[in-house]
Amino acid sequence: ATKTNDKISYSDETTFVNNVANTGVPSIDPAYYYVKSSVIKAYNTANSTTVERNFYEIEGLQEALKYFKSFDNRDIAEDYNMQGVIIVPSRAAFARDNSIYGTAYQNRSFVFNFQLYNTRTRLPKED
């Protein structure tokens, strides 16, 4: 959204990720949802920085997904049955923060249509 003459309006839309139209294969733990600690550590070491999870992850998305139940033992090849929609306002997403995507997604709201499959608690060795 942009503010001009004290009026707020939405700017142009951009597709962030679209698995249905592209491969049809669901994303499994994409970095905008969950990034491993080892990835953050490697980035910080390589770039002499101290970035945290919010450098990669869209804040608020994990919390919102907790309100939806996963479809267990469902074949990934089955057609999508969009389970829900989550809208993450720009101030809760990347806002004006520095991110791995640069400035491309600053001040952008995100709308996620999704289907959750076979969720489980992440094991410590998977981080």
Regions found by a protein language model. Give the residues of each.
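Cross-family detector of peptidyl-prolyl cis-trans isomerase
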Residues: 1-127
